[in-house]
Amino acid sequence: MLRMAVWAGTLLLIGDRMLGAVTVQRINYYGWEGAYRMTNGTAELVFVPQIGRVMRYGYVGGANLLWENAALWGRTSDPAQTTDWINYGGDKLWPAPQERWGWPPDPALDGSPHAVTVLPDSRLRVESPVSEKHGIRFVREITLAASGTEVTFLNTMINVSDHEQRWSVWQVTQIDDPDVTEMPSYTRGRNPKGYYLFKDADPAAGMLTQEKGRVRLRRSAVKASKIGGDSPQGWIAARRGTLRLTMSAAYEPGQEYPDNGSMLEIYTNPDPLRYIELELLGPIRTLRPGAQTSFTTRWRLERVSQTETR
């Protein structure tokens, strides 16, 4: 009932216009005033500037593929007072490799207000605060195609410090309890098994399978797990019911990637927070002061039969 109350005003607007053009509206999204809703009449995406992330992606009027922490709807946090990770859900950027910063993520990048500009062609330009901890800031340009469901993210990391920084752009997307996730199995790279298994993160019995050139991972209710992959095919996907979300990026041969060469990563979270993370990572770059690097990723949503795998 809450979702209908939130969206009733915008659904009427959709019926009054032709499909095939992207519009951007300011809405109240579960208590966050002034959220940005992009739609082309088929798909829609919502960016919440107060917490710096995409919080909704799906078909117009349909289910949200992204996981949201309903206990935190409408809430914000003060980065100066934040000592632990506040897990709002949705999609955001971190720097990688994680082993260089441990835990929690810098609240300047994860949970702080981001500046948003609507560009003339209905793209969103999103700018994070400066991360003093990492010496960087992120700038994202988010483009929804004029028709269909494809979203393109131009994710740029800028060195705002006075010395070299060496990082990868890491896009972390939390998916609402999918039935299964998958990525290509690739045995000709750095992982003879076809995937990389993170230390102390092996899947529960029966949760990981390999068939037809793919690695499939399901969520366990009691145990977290994480795998990575270095397939040059460069895609990763999740399916829930008859909805399939595929995320992709171009693999760059010969470049250094985090986590034993992983460009693709899947993390499964146990109950009570029922989500899986699909993660795309760019090459590790050494940036001089003022230099920047960009990593382009794409999302595509489609309807499939429950027996279809791709």
Predicted regions and their residues:
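Bacterial N-terminal signal peptides
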Residues: 5-16
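Short, Gly/Pro- and small/polar-rich lid/capping loops
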Residues: 19-36
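Short, hydrophobic/aromatic-enriched beta-strand segments in well-ordered soluble domains
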Residues: 42, 128, 291-303
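Solvent-exposed N-terminal domain segments of exported/luminal and surface proteins
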Residues: 43-44, 49-106
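Extended, loop-rich substrate-binding clefts of extracytoplasmic carbohydrate-active enzymes
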Residues: 23-25, 95-149, 166-167, 178-180, ...
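A contiguous, surface-exposed recognition patch within enzymatic or periplasmic domains that forms
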Residues: 36, 43-45, 50-57, 64-66, ...
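Hydrophobic core residues within well-ordered beta-strands of beta-rich domains
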Residues: 138, 151-153, 293
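Beta-strand elements of well-folded, non-transmembrane domains
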Residues: 130-132, 144-146, 157-161, 282-286, ...
